[in-house]
């Protein structure tokens, strides 16, 4: 008969044959015994981390009991009153669960007195029974004993037929989600402990569970499972990152879909632009250095705001940094030409210069051709600084360059997460919570076109792959929190600029216009503005000036 979750089980190993008189067991016999013990221990460990209270050596006995149970259930003489209201707890404890059902079915007379019987083992079947507590805060481990017990009801789900009564087991999606999360964390723990055999078995289990889990949880688990598999098999380098290898501009295309699908990038651009506008209120010439131009989506809105300024718009000079171009492409200049057309329509005097750089740490002050006597200088970075943390000294080199050109304001937008820790398991747990919130917010945007949603998920999935599977200089998605960036910026000689209540109110208004889900939140925290989903902040905008 079928086993739980479609798995099959081998009977316990047979005893070794007795050795001949005067002879000890052969080396082959010893090796076979060791292999059997190792396999048995491996199965026991896998069953434990997946929440089943049974050993592989007990599976033959459990299978025999299940066959007896099937024979009893197929008997039409079994009174329906025994089945209808029976409640059995803890099916993860296979042996006791089957034993309790057989015991009740073999004593149907007692059901007249109490139609609800239970076999309860509360110590092992809640979330604490499965390894991976680090995925859940300890203060949330409060359970109502009656409400939290998992039940399988027989009778109401069993339909009699002329042939036999068949039991249908319905798997609760919430319980599957819990098992999925715990299997993910258990796999990460196995990798952390360098138990790659167990990790390999668990990542396959995650793939099976993820395939049966609908919604955001199933999607994010699939990306994490792929990343864990790449780490287990050591199959990740910058060269094997398929999306980047196909075309460096592919990520820019993905980012455009992410921009359209949710308010995070809109919030980033809007709040940074608000800080810039307040810093250049009286300036007649504005020079913005964008450390990551991408598709230039941030700047039309700023030019439009400058065009509406009383007394006429200032001149606007934009220096955009981008990756090195291919031989037959000059996308930076093409983008500059499009922005120039837009500026002309707005009546804004515009000048553009594109700079190609392998790394932002390669930039030197003289490359920017600043005009301090006549221009107000602005430096802008959206999701760029964290990439420099992959190489020692790179972020310090860039910040020293920025400091040397003496900007009036530096605007910084970064992910509000700590994915730069040296301990893999901590980084994994943080990433699992962070990206689960992002995927959940995408799933809640019910009016989102399917193409935008899918491409946005790919955009985030690439980040998950890098955070989990990569190491060394290949791991560039090294996000840090606002508190961590505050320490870095202050040590480099910058002081924070408080983003005031006006920016907060306008950001909240923007959110009401563009956000399709009702779980988005804007908050002000220590002079920074944050956007998040439900109670979790996800993106932070901050502004800085020379100390």
UniProtKB/Swiss-Prot annotation:
UniProt note on tissues of expression? Predominantly expressed in germinating seeds, flowers and siliques. Only detectable in the inflorescence, with high levels in young flower buds and significant levels in siliques. In imbibed seeds, it is restricted to seed coats, elongating regions of pre-emergent and recently emerged radicles, endosperm (especially micropylar endosperm), and embryonic axis. Not expressed in leaves, bolting stems or roots.
Q: Tell me the outcome of changing residue 319 to E.
A: Resistant to GA-mediated degradation
Q: Which parts of the sequence form the motif LEXLE motif?
A: 66-70
What InterPro entries would the database entry show? DELLA_N_sf, TF_DELLA_N, TF_GRAS
User: What does the record say about the knockout?
Assistant: Higher germination rate in the presence of glucose and at supraoptimal temperature conditions. Rga, gai, rgl1, rgl2 and rgl3 pentuple mutant displays constitutive GA responses even in the absence of GA treatment.
Q: What is the effect of changing residue 223 to A/E?
A: Resistant to GA-mediated degradation
Keyword DNA repair part of the UniProt annotation: no
- Kindly summarize what the UniProt induction comment says about this protein's expression: Up-regulated transiently following seed imbibition to decline rapidly as germination proceeds; this induction is delayed at supraoptimal temperature conditions (e.g. 34 degrees Celsius). Accumulates in seed coats of dormant seeds where germination does not occur after imbibition. Increased levels upon abscisic acid (ABA) treatment. Down-regulated by norflurazon (NF), an ABA biosynthesis inhibitor. Induced by stress such as glucose, salt or mannitol treatment. Upon seed imbibition, increased GA levels in the epidermis reduce DELLA proteins (e.g.
Q: Where is this motif: VHIID?
A: 286-290
Reported effect of changing residue 319 to C?
A: No effect on GA-mediated degradation
Task: Please state every residue range assigned to the domain named GRAS.
Answer: 171-545
Disordered, as annotated region: 1-42
Q: What does the record say mutating residue 435 to F does?
A: No effect on GA-mediated degradation
The record's similarity note reads: Belongs to the GRAS family. DELLA subfamily.
Domain free text: The DELLA motif is required for its GA-induced degradation but not for the interaction with GID2.
Q: What protein name is recorded for this chain?
A: DELLA protein RGL2
- Species lineage, top-down? Eukaryota, Viridiplantae, Streptophyta, Embryophyta, Tracheophyta
- Identify the gene encoding this protein: RGL2
């Amino acid at each position: 008969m079928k086993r739980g979750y479609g798995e099959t089980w081998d009977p316990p190993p047979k005893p070794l044959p007795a050795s001949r008189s005067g002879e000890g067991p052969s080396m082959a016999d010893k090796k076979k015994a060791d292999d059997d013990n190792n396999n048995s221990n491996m199965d026991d460990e896998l069953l434990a981390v997946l929440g089943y209270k049974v050993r592989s050596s007990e599976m033959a006995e459990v299978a025999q009991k299940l066959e007896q149970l099937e024979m009893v259930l197929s008997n039409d003489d079994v009174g329906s009153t025994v089945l209808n209201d029976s409640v059995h707890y803890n099916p993860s404890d296979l042996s006791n669960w089957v034993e309790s059902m057989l015991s009740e079915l073999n004593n149907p007379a007692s059901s007249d007195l109490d139609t609800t019987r239970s076999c309860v083992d509360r110590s092992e079947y809640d979330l604490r029974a499965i390894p991976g507590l680090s995925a859940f805060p300890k203060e949330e481990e409060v359970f109502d004993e009656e409400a939290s017990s998992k039940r399988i009801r027989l009778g109401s789900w069993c339909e009699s037929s002329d042939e036999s009564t068949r039991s249908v087991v319905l798997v609760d999606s919430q319980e599957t989600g819990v098992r999925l999360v715990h299997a993910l964390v258990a796999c990460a723990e196995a990798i952390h402990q360098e138990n790659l055999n167990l990790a390999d078995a668990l990542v396959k289990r995650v793939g099976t569970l993820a395939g049966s889990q609908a919604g955001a949880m199933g999607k994010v688990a699939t990306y994490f499972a792929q990343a864990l598999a790449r780490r287990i098999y050591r199959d990740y380098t910058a060269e094997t990152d398929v999306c980047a290898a196909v075309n460096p501009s592919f990520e820019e295309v993905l980012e455009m879909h992410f921009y359209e699908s949710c308010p995070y990038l809109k919030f980033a651009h809007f709040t940074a632009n608000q800080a810039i506008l307040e810093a250049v209120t009286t300036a007649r010439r504005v020079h913005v250095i964008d450390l990551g131009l991408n598709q230039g989506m941030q700047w039309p809105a700023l030019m439009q705001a400058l065009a509406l300024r009383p007394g006429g718009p200032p001149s606007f000079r934009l220096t955009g940094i981008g990756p090195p171009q291919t031989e037959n492409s000059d996308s930076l200049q093409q983008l500059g030409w499009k922005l120039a057309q837009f500026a002309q329509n707005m009546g804004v005097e515009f000048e553009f210069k594109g700079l190609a750089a392998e790394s932002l740490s390669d930039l030197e002050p003289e490359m920017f051709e600043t005009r301090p006597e006549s221009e107000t200088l602005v430096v802008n970075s959206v999701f760029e600084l964290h990439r420099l943390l992959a190489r020692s000294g790179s972020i310090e080199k860039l910040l020293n360059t920025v400091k040397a050109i003496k900007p009036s304001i530096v605007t910084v937008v970064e992910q509000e997460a700590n994915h730069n820790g040296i301990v893999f398991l901590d980084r994994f747990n943080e990433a699992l919570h962070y990206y689960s919130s992002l995927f959940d917010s995408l799933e809640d945007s019910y009016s989102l076109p399917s193409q935008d949603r899918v491409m946005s998920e790919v955009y985030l999935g690439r980040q998950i792959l890098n955070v989990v599977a990569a190491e060394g200089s290949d791991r560039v998605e090294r996000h840090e929190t606002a508190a961590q960036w505050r320490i870095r910026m202050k040590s480099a000689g910058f002081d924070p600029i408080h983003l005031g209540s006006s920016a907060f109110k306008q950001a909240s208004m923007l959110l009401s216009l563009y956000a399709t889900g009702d779980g988005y939140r804007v908050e002000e925290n220590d002079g920074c503005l944050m956007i998040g989903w439900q109670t979790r902040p996800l993106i932070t905008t901050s502004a800085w000036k020379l100390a």
